[in-house]
Amino acid sequence: MNPEILQQDAKLAELVRRLVESYRPDRLYLFGSRGRQEAKPDSDYDLLMVLAELDAPAYRIAQHAHRLVWGLEISADILVWSRDEFDRRVEVKASLPATILREGMLLHAA
């Protein structure tokens, strides 16, 4: 996990707190330019939330999760995957999960 980035970025820390409180994810990753620590001041936040089970389609959960960004004055994309799907796809080197594990940051683990 990378608690240092959460200490340096109060808005990200608040978004992580909101997501963890609302969804209790298995894991929460930061990826993209911010995950690689190549972000510019106006870069968005790319987050992947891994849930034990999906109780609705992933896109619906992501739409609802995106509402938690409100009031933080940041731009964020939140993806949602089930634990099984993430773990299955991580074996494929060119997949998003594999890329996130290589280049991203783990922000939360249950």
Each language-model region and where it sits:
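Catalytic core of pol beta-like nucleotidyltransferases
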Residues: M1-R27, G35-P41, L51-A110
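Short beta-strand->loop micro-motif that forms the acidic, two-metal-ion catalytic signature
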Residues: D46-V50
